[in-house]
Amino acid sequence: MMPQHHLPADIERTSMKIITGELAQRGLDIPPENAPVVKRAIHTTADFDYAQTLHFTPGAVAAGIAAMHAGATIITDTNMALAGITKPGLAKLGGQALCFMADPAVAAAAKQAGTTRAVAAMQKAAAEYPGAVLAVGNAPTALLTIAEKIENGLRPALVIGVPVGFVNVVESKERLFAVCESHGVPAIVAMGRKGGSNVAAAICNALIYSAAEMLDPTARGWK
């Protein structure tokens, strides 16, 4: 009979042990500094492909943790990603999370320019929060906008590029990662088609938990 796990902290700890064991069984060796992010993505999706598809520029995780320590502003491209980010942990660090997709000014700017709200939202983010953590889980056009802004001098604290889909997704991720590498901007990118708002939020949470020393669920008040 399988053991029953009812308490959230127990469930999460057991899940992480299973993930660690399966990574070892599959011969997947994750650099220790990247492990919290990779394991959190797998925990969220039950998809071990992220152990191989998540790509990191040098020091990206350390840069993300440092940004959280400094009270980062996280800007997402969807309200779903925004909803998934742990607000208590972020608030403890003095940070905030924002999404501009529902901003009337963004909608008006997108309509006037004949572009998407995702593009207009990232343009607003670049103008108002140039040192933010940018977390994209849905719109490849947002990644292309960020890449262009970086080429023109934008220096976000970290870019998380994990949109999901079939059209322009792979190409936008590859372009963003190449631009971030060449310009020294920290980036975490899920290569290929997979990703999503839940993955973007999970990566943010891994960084927040690490910064707040809340990797163990009991440190987050879970029983």
Where do the language-model regions lie?
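Short glycine/serine/threonine-rich phosphate/pyrophosphate-binding segments
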Residues: 81-84, 140-146, 166-170, 196-200
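Buried hydrophobic positions in well-ordered alpha/beta secondary-structure cores of metabolic enzymes
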Residues: 77, 159-161, 203
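Long, charge-dense
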Residues: 90-129
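Active-site cofactor/substrate anionic-group-binding motifs, chiefly glycine-
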Residues: 51-105
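C-terminal functional extensions of proteins
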Residues: 167-223
